[in-house]
Design a protein with these regions (language model features):
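Beta-propeller blade signature
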Residues: 43-44, 88-93, 193-202, 258-266, ...
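Extracellular glycan-recognition regions
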Residues: 249, 267-476
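Short glycine/acidic-enriched loop and turn motifs that connect beta-strands
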Residues: 33-36, 85, 129-131, 183-187, ...
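Entry beta-strands of beta-propeller and related beta-repeat scaffolds
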Residues: 25-27, 75-78, 119-122, 175-178, ...
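Blade-level signature of beta-propeller repeat domains, shared across WD40, Kelch, NHL, RCC1
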Residues: 240-246, 251-266, 270-274
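Surface loop/turn signatures of beta-propeller and other carbohydrate-active proteins
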Residues: 1-21, 34, 47-71, 97-115, ...
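Short, conserved, GDST-rich strand-edge loop motifs in beta-rich repeat architectures
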Residues: 181-189, 246-255, 541-569
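Loop/turn-rich, solvent-exposed surfaces of beta-rich toroidal or solenoidal domains
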Residues: 164-207, 213-215
């Protein structure tokens, strides 16, 4: 049965995907940057369900990124850039052991390996450059040569830079296909893209595809921003796919997720994406995803965890289901952090914490040394970070043994603590963490959940939990209805336990006054919808039919009623909330969207659905 695409195969921070097939098995890895141990290898048999296998680079090598994972003859390789040069590791078994990194002593980023028809090996890097490799692939021969200039996209496109990078190569029907990224990895929502070129020779000359860009975000209203860094993969049935990364709209904080789309080959020998395809049937069922919750049974750290800018397994001790982590530094900026990747727009995480004398520990959301938020304690006071530069203090009346809980709901963070994990005290709420991402702090990282230990001695962590916090239907307790009244043109709400008998909220007065949100100082026809992310979406007509009577307008309608008819408004009010209290608003004017809508008669009674 055909399914529609694109689809997310790994939500959260899984950027720069590199994918390969070995018979019926598919393997994939991503950029680890400063997270160590690095290069988490994933395994699948249907391209949709992935299980984590191992981490292959335990030692810390600096910011490693944009790898190329492949198998040549009987050996697996990972080529990657770090510390101003390119490296390679190899293994006979995908699960290891893997070799120590070998310095290729060649600059550039985003390496892409290819073998020509004579068996010669080459390595492409960014800027359209290529260099010959030795037969074993562990050294280079000669100098880099520029062989490709990229694809000239329209000048008016809003991008970050030309940034020709991510060269990945495949051979198909007598051609070599060079798949590259352009436009910049972050920056504007429309920055990134995937482009294609082909050649009869592995070193060019390259002819650009008439279907470029293959993948691109065309508008900031698209569901996925900065789509790019694509790699082609064929499945066991001979179908082809493209895997790439992208930011979820409005969620740079989550990092770049890994997505997949099917492609088709045209009669003239090019490829392009299609919206539907039949997925692969696996030989064995694979449980998808990485379990983030942890009871710290030991004796080794789970695959969900990484250190930041170090690899310090000797700092960890497992004892009686408690992870003891040796402290260092004084604050989250220089302390020891253990991080895991958040996957959801709305999630909750908690952990039981024990601090020692002179020790500070906590639960935080961590981007880098200059961007983090959460709660830490020395047993005497709680320190709540809204960001690295904004810290408040509250008395700790619980002591050195406490529970901490963070709820990140649409980039709005609440912080709670508890003595027993049952009754919670809110220390802070509605803290905005939406700015803690690459476009403000650089680095291409993500806002990850972190365990933090600083000062002296060790901090103890147990019963770590992470869960998607979108409410389940069985946890809901009432029906909500929204409506308007002609006498006040405001938004009213009512609730019901059974869906039949409703009680008005706010003593029957408007919950939101129309003159505070609408251009015409009144709203009508409200519709509310709860999205799959758990947020509430409101849509309303921007219209006050008695605006002249109530002194908001000198005329009966905004325009001549004889020519444009009753009401003749051209606006809607769109709002979003996670808690029905704090709302974001957009005032939509159709005549401002397009000249085609400038003479629209009346826009009213909208309905939102997903």
């Amino acid at each position: 049965k055909k399914k529609t695409y694109p689809k997310v195969i790994l939500p959260g921070d899984y950027p720069d995907p590199s994918i390969m097939r070995d018979g019926k098995d598919y393997y994939m890895t991503h950029s680890p940057f400063y997270y160590a141990p690095g290069f988490l290898i994933w395994h699948s048999q249907d391209l949709m369900n992935w299980e984590p296998l191992c981490r292959v680079m335990p030692q810390y090598e600096g910011s490693a990124m944009a790898p190329d994972l492949l198998k040549y003859k009987d050996t697996y390789y990972i080529y990657y850039p770090a510390a101003g040069t390119n490296w390679v590791m190899w293994a006979k078994d995908i699960r290891g052991p893997w070799s120590l990194p070998v310095d290729l002593k060649v600059g550039g980023i985003d390496p892409g390996h290819v073998v020509d028809r004579e068996g010669n090996r080459y390595l492409y890097v960014d800027k359209g450059e290529v260099i010959r490799l030795t037969e074993d692939g562990l050294a280079t021969v000669g100098e880099k040569k520029k062989v490709y200039d990229g694809w000239k996209y329209p000048d008016h496109w809003d991008t970050e830079c030309m940034c020709l990078e991510s060269p990945k190569l495949n051979e198909h029907n007598g051609y070599y296909y060079l798949t590259s990224a352009q436009g910049g990895t972050a920056g504007p929502a429309t920055s990134h893209m995937v482009v294609s070129a082909r050649s009869k020779s592995v070193t060019g000359p390259w002819e650009n595809s008439p279907y470029n860009p293959i993948v691109h975000t065309y508008s900031a209203t698209d569901s996925w921003w900065s789509k790019g860094h694509g790699t082609l993969i064929d499945d066991v049935n001979g179908n082809w796919w493209i895997v790439y990364h992208a930011y979820a709209n409005g969620y740079h904080t989550l990092g770049r997720s890994t997505l997949i789309e099917p492609i088709e080959w045209t009669e003239d020998g090019w490829y392009r994406t299609v919206s539907a395809a039949t997925p692969v049937t696996p030989e064995q069922e694979i449980k998808h995803g990485l379990e983030l919750s942890d009871d710290f049974k030991g004796p080794q750290l789970g695959l969900q965890w990484t250190f930041w800018k170090e690899y310090a397994p000797k700092s960890l001790t497992f004892k009686e289901d408690i992870l003891w982590m040796k402290a260092k530094g004084r604050t989250p900026a220089d302390g020891r952090v253990l991080l895991t990747t958040a996957e959801d727009k709305n999630y909750e995480t908690q952990v039981e914490i024990r601090t020692g004398n002179g020790n500070v520990a906590g639960l935080i959301l961590y981007y880098n040394e200059k961007a983090y938020a959460g709660v830490v304690s020395d047993g005497k006071r709680f320190y709540i970070y809204r960001n690295a530069e904004h810290k408040t203090e509250l008395p700790n009346r619980i002591g050195k043994h406490f529970f901490a809980r963070l709820h990140n709901c649409g980039n709005r963070l609440s912080v709670e603590v508890s003595k027993d994990g049952e009754e919670w005290t809110v220390l802070a709420s509605d803290m905005d963490v939406s700015s803690l991402h690459h476009n403000n702090y650089g680095g291409f990282y993500a806002l990850r959940v972190g365990l933090f230990s600083a000062g002296k001695g060790s901090s103890g962590f147990s019963r770590f939990r992470y869960r998607n916090a979108v409410p389940r239907e069985k946890d809901m307790s009432a029906y909500l209805m929204v409506f308007h009244k002609d006498e006040d043109h405001g938004l009213h709400m009512a609730i019901s336990p059974d869906g039949y008998t409703f009680t008005a909220l706010n003593e029957g007065k408007p919950v939101i006054a129309g003159d505070t949100i609408a251009e015409q100082k009144g709203i009508r026809d409200p519709h509310i919808f709860r999205g799959p992310d758990g947020a509430f979406y409101l849509s309303m007509t921007d219209l006050h039919i008695y605006a002249q009577r109530d002194g908001y307008r000198d005329t009966e309608w905004e325009r001549d009623g004889k020519e444009y008819g009753w009401g003749n408004n051209r606006g809607l009010v769109l709002m979003k909330s996670w808690d029905l209290i704090h709302w974001k608003r957009t005032n939509l004017r159709f005549d401002k969207l397009s000249a085609a809508y400038s003479e629209v008669g009346c826009a009213w009674a909208p309905e939102v659905f997903f």
